[in-house]
Amino acid sequence: MGGSSRARWVALGLGALGLLFAALGVVMILMVPSLIKQQVLKNVRIDPSSLSFGMWKEIPVPFYLSVYFFEVVNPNEVLNGQKPVVRERGPYVYREFRQKVNITFNDNDTVSFVENRSLHFQPDKSHGSESDYIVLPNILVLGGSILMESKPVSLKLMMTLALVTMGQRAFMNRTVGEILWGYDDPFVHFLNTYLPDMLPIKGKFGLFVGMNNSNSGVFTVFTGVQNFSRIHLVDKWNGLSKIDYWHSEQCNMINGTSGQMWAPFMTPESSLEFFSPEACRSMKLTYNESRVFEGIPTYRFTAPDTLFANGSVYPPNEGFCPCRESGIQNVSTCRFGAPLFLSHPHFYNADPVLSEAVLGLNPNPKEHSLFLDIHPVTGIPMNCSVKMQLSLYIKSVKGIGQTGKIEPVVLPLLWFEQSGAMGGKPLSTFYTQLVLMPQVLHYAQYVLLGLGGLLLLVPIICQLRSQEKCFLFWSGSKKGSQDKEAIQAYSESLMSPAAKGTVLQEAKL
């Protein structure tokens, strides 16, 4: 009896423990999603106490700017009206460092800051050096000629004579460093003297002269501390709640974030919106597919076909016009009238007429499309590759001899890629705190529930087995009594007189 009693108490103890585990599992199922959400919101908001604040303040991920040039192989033939032939040169790679300074938290749940940016050439990652010479269109001559097209003949003649005097030609042969970071040009001085509002610069002229050791202006964004629904959204840029470069209210809107973090808890229906001062507009990327980056689940967002579509293909983009072929965006209104166009590299996803007008272009999605891989729970980018091309519209301008017989064409100048992928300690910390721990909690709730269910079966099984033993005992006892009664009855029948006589008769026979 003692052993049976102990077994019964053990079974009851295991059952109680199972009930406790099951209750904990149910509580976790009800509470864990809310706890995870609170933990994520606590760590992605712009607040000095949040886990992501240091990452937001100074990007710890190695970020690179890779530049590819379209060298013009046949400049003399282009001047005589032939189709341009280009050859891609590069990449020329720069390590990009970004740090937010002048961080000021405001009373309306926003924070203002300036993000300083510096670029450092990486010879080991580049195919060439900054001293490489490259033949490109002379933007000052050909771009300036377009701007002078509607000017009086006298001004055109003055410009032609000035170009001859200064030895300026339609195409130039300069180093990578000069093209990107600037060079002294007497023509810049001439334009600033006689057409003072034509150029935004007073010193050196270069395509990226304002990108190094500089910033993109003052951003004011929502922190998400008081109102989670607006987290990371841009409130103002340089004090403006909208821009005035374009011809419609929609195109002038400042939408989305500053392009570094987005709101958490994304779904495949979510989109990535951000404002780019360099592109002078807001952009929207759409969900493409689910992926895994270094063990972390991500959503890949890519550019829709409508991003650079013209107004006839996509009416909401009409405000960015005057437009040319679909797939390129005229950015002259925010580049002081210079006939510059923004697009995907090699005119990928643009009207084929554009790539067919220039020999040497080979657009393909693998090499020339852009993407951002975002962790959907936190809205933090894990891997990104943003690619853009800058092109110049050139043609012969009557009255300016340097433009020769150039046929109208949108000629690519260069394309660049800004890329970065989270790794090292930041990736490890991110994975542990915001991926691994939520996963452990998620699975723990079901483990507890399952284990609790199994332990609850122990006393039930023991009870059933105990009842079975009792049944067998009583069944056995009843059967034994019946057998004894049968034997006794048989014995008594043998001892009766009638039975004895029968037995004697059988013996005599």
From Swiss-Prot:
Residues 33-440 are extracellular. Keywords: Cell membrane, Disulfide bond, Glycoprotein, Lipoprotein, Membrane, Palmitate, Receptor, Transmembrane, Transmembrane helix. GO terms for cellular component: caveola; cell surface; cytoplasm; lysosome; membrane; plasma membrane. GO terms for molecular function: amyloid-beta binding; apolipoprotein A-I binding; apolipoprotein binding; high-density lipoprotein particle binding; high-density lipoprotein particle receptor activity; lipopolysaccharide binding; lipopolysaccharide immune receptor activity; low-density lipoprotein particle binding. N-glycosylated. The six cysteines of the extracellular domain are all involved in intramolecular disulfide bonds. Induction: Both isoform 1 and isoform 2 are up-regulated in response to adrenocorticotropic hormone (ACTH). Expressed primarily in liver, ovary and adrenal gland, and, at lower levels in other non-placental steroidogenic tissues, including adipose tissue, mammary gland and testis (at protein level). Isoform 2 is expressed at lower levels than isoform 1 in liver, testis and adrenal gland. At the mRNA, but not at the protein level, isoform 2 is the predominant isoform in testis (80%). Glycans are attached at N102, N108, N116, N173, N212, N227, N255, N288, N310, N330, N383. Disulfide bonds join C251-C384. The keyword Transmembrane helix applies. Residues 1-11, 462-509 are cytoplasmic. Coiled coil: none annotated. GO terms for biological process: adhesion of symbiont to host; blood vessel endothelial cell migration; cholesterol catabolic process; cholesterol efflux; cholesterol homeostasis; cholesterol import; cholesterol transport; detection of lipopolysaccharide. A lipid is attached at C462 (S-palmitoyl cysteine). It is found in: Cell membrane; Membrane, Caveola. The chain crosses the membrane at residues 12-32, 441-461. InterPro entries: CD36/SCARB1/SNMP1, CD36_fam. It is a multi-pass membrane protein. Receptor for different ligands such as phospholipids, cholesterol ester, lipoproteins, phosphatidylserine and apoptotic cells. Both isoform 1 and isoform 2 act as receptors for HDL, mediating selective uptake of cholesteryl ether and HDL-dependent cholesterol efflux. Also facilitates the flux of free and esterified cholesterol between the cell surface and apoB-containing lipoproteins and modified lipoproteins, although less efficiently than HDL. May be involved in the phagocytosis of apoptotic cells, via its phosphatidylserine binding activity. Belongs to the CD36 family. The C-terminal region binds to PDZK1. This is Scavenger receptor class B member 1. The lineage of its organism: Eukaryota, Metazoa, Chordata, Craniata, Vertebrata.
